[in-house]
Design a protein with these regions (language model features):
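Conserved active-site-adjacent core of cysteine acyl-enzyme catalytic domains
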Residues: 1-126
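A contiguous loop/helix-start segment that scaffolds small-molecule binding in enzyme catalytic cores
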Residues: 129
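Cytosolic-side membrane-insertion boundary helix
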Residues: 134-136
Length: 136
C-alpha cells in the first residue's frame, strides 16, 4: 500500500469550488487553515472554476512548494496527498484529492461526494494524467 494517510473532507458548495476545496483539504492535512473565500481569491476562481496553475500559485502563498506533473501511470505518484485533475464523462473538469493507491483501488476525497473508493481502471478513464503535488 502506498501513502496511508487520512484526509479531511472539504465539501464544495458550488460547482466551481472543487479545486479550492481540494487545496483546502491539503492545507488542513498539514495542520494549516485558510478561509475558503481567501483561497478562491488567491486562486483566481471564476465561474468556470480554477486552473491548475492558479491552485499551485495560491498554495505557494501558504508556504507550499508545489508543481503540476503529467504522468504515464497512476502508480507513478509517489507524494500523497496529491490533487488529481479529472475529465468527467459529462464534459466537466474536476479535482479530487488522492489519499492512497493499492493494486486495484484508489482512495480519494472528492469535494462533491466526500470519501470515495474507486477501481483504478474506472479512475483512469476519467483522469487527465495530471496531478498537483504539494510539499509543506
Amino acid at each position: 500500500m502506498k501513502g496511508e494517510i487520512y484526509m479531511i473532507v472539504v465539501r464544495q458548495r458550488d460547482e466551481k469550488d472543487c479545486g479550492v476545496c481540494a487545496l483546502l483539504s491539503i492545507i488542513r492535512h498539514y495542520k494549516g487553515n485558510v478561509p475558503l473565500e481567501k483561497i478562491r481569491l488567491d486562486a483566481k476562481t471564476t465561474n468556470e472554476g480554477t486552473t491548475a496553475l492558479n491552485l499551485i500559485l495560491a498554495s505557494q502563498k501558504y508556504g507550499f512548494e508545489a508543481m503540476g506533473v503529467k504522468l504515464n501511470s497512476i502508480y507513478d505518484i509517489k507524494q500523497f496527498p496529491a490533487i488529481a485533475h479529472m475529465n468527467l464523462k459529462k464534459g466537466y473538469t474536476h479535482y479530487v484529492v488522492i489519499e492512497k493507491i493499492t493494486k486495484d483501488k484508489i482512495f480519494i476525497m472528492d469535494p462533491a461526494k466526500g470519501k470515495v473508493v474507486m477501481k483504478v481502471n474506472d479512475f483512469i478513464c476519467e483522469w487527465s494524467n495530471v496531478v498537483l503535488l504539494f510539499y509543506p
